[in-house]
């Protein structure tokens, strides 16, 4: 469940606020992955020397000491990164795609834009070509790879954008419970905590109430919301725990 914002940390309104563990829970990934992608990391190269891998982008929120905290747009960009990785797209291709998309879209976080939804295929395929090993175009393996990855891109974009709301060219909301309208993550509301969309109650509070009361009906009466809303909140919170 989302943690309380540090008392001394002033978060600009409308951006959203997530600690690394909170974001990892919503994205169903390990916290270390988010830290590596947004903080960078080091690894030992083939020659035995340490190599520094830079962050994929800079987080929306300023650092408070050593703590990495991210905004809503960061969360959605990370969701795309994960979607590509889960389709076996290498991280170096994703990094190149981000760089190329930034230059074309003009946004630091280009995946969470309408422009990437419409023009991203060509950006992705060009990034893939640039990342292909030398000589693969001559032996024909590039053709197979590009055809396969056209389908990969289509699947990632269709699945990832289907539960996102876009306004003025940018992703502004995420409906994280299978796209159902009852639950929303909106950076303009409660710092981006998952909420019952029409009532504003945090899903975590609804789920806790249902557990404490031993009944979704009693929790619904307590919060003055329909039982179906509590059921969805409980289902959503349980899905995060099971991930």
Where are these regions (language model features)?
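Long, charge-rich, low-complexity intrinsically disordered regions
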Residues: 1-36, 42, 52, 65-70, ...
